[in-house]
């Protein structure tokens, strides 16, 4: 009982992680590593579309074919659809089960391999699945308790991250709207011309050349750039005689300009 309590506390301590610490390519790798260590298993966290948010391989079970899925950070659609139909934890699925995470070509190598899938919920919504597996050791009741707690903890973190992302999107959109509202017609025209000059989200431009091309003064372009930069939409740096280096850091400006085209 003491061991179970200790492991439970280690899992719930994951909630103390800030959302900022999850802003990475595989934001849940650290969490998956902890779960794999605590429960003694391999662990994989996927979202509702099968995107791999994080995984930990304590034991090697993948073939080269399956390893490609993990490297691509996306599980096969058929498998994801089947996993999404699980509404309660399915424990100790054998290698013969369609939902086994073990590669079909390695069934003879890991005949006793077991997979457990726990749905991840947050705010009443299905957010993904927690998949854990072992080569030969059955997940007992204590393990299943830890798995249920783990899926709840991950669900809370996923929901927190979604909320954070939504707030960031709203903040960026508000900044764009406020900046657009301060632009005159000529400045709006200048912004559209400037962004068309960029190679993707960044590039070098010469204000005087753009001004002559669209029939406005150079000062209009300078004012427009200053307003966008103060709103946190772009970053600029003078290159002297070579012009100005510009980088868009709030990409929503591209979509916003389409509304005015």
Swiss-Prot record:
<keyword id="KW-0238">DNA-binding</keyword>
<dbReference type="GO" id="GO:0045892">
    <property type="term" value="P:negative regulation of DNA-templated transcription"/>
</dbReference>
<feature type="region of interest" description="GAF domain">
    <location>
        <begin position="1"/>
        <end position="159"/>
    </location>
</feature>
<dbReference type="Pfam" id="PF06018">
    <property type="entry name" value="CodY"/>
</dbReference>
<dbReference type="InterPro" id="IPR036390">
    <property type="entry name" value="WH_DNA-bd_sf"/>
</dbReference>
<comment type="function">
    <text>DNA-binding global transcriptional regulator which is involved in the adaptive response to starvation and acts by directly or indirectly controlling the expression of numerous genes in response to nutrient availability. During rapid exponential growth, CodY is highly active and represses genes whose products allow adaptation to nutrient depletion.</text>
</comment>
<dbReference type="InterPro" id="IPR029016">
    <property type="entry name" value="GAF-like_dom_sf"/>
</dbReference>
<dbReference type="GO" id="GO:0003700">
    <property type="term" value="F:DNA-binding transcription factor activity"/>
</dbReference>
<dbReference type="InterPro" id="IPR013198">
    <property type="entry name" value="GTP_trans_reg_CodY_C"/>
</dbReference>
<keyword id="KW-0678">Repressor</keyword>
<comment type="similarity">
    <text>Belongs to the CodY family.</text>
</comment>
<feature type="DNA-binding region" description="H-T-H motif">
    <location>
        <begin position="207"/>
        <end position="226"/>
    </location>
</feature>
<keyword id="KW-0804">Transcription</keyword>
<protein>
    <recommendedName>
        <fullName>Global transcriptional regulator CodY</fullName>
    </recommendedName>
</protein>
<dbReference type="GO" id="GO:0005737">
    <property type="term" value="C:cytoplasm"/>
</dbReference>
<keyword id="KW-0963">Cytoplasm</keyword>
<dbReference type="InterPro" id="IPR014154">
    <property type="entry name" value="CodY"/>
</dbReference>
<dbReference type="InterPro" id="IPR011991">
    <property type="entry name" value="ArsR-like_HTH"/>
</dbReference>
<dbReference type="InterPro" id="IPR036388">
    <property type="entry name" value="WH-like_DNA-bd_sf"/>
</dbReference>
<keyword id="KW-0805">Transcription regulation</keyword>
<dbReference type="Pfam" id="PF08222">
    <property type="entry name" value="HTH_CodY"/>
</dbReference>
<dbReference type="InterPro" id="IPR010312">
    <property type="entry name" value="Transc_reg_CodY_N"/>
</dbReference>
<dbReference type="GO" id="GO:0003677">
    <property type="term" value="F:DNA binding"/>
</dbReference>
<dbReference type="GO" id="GO:0005525">
    <property type="term" value="F:GTP binding"/>
</dbReference>
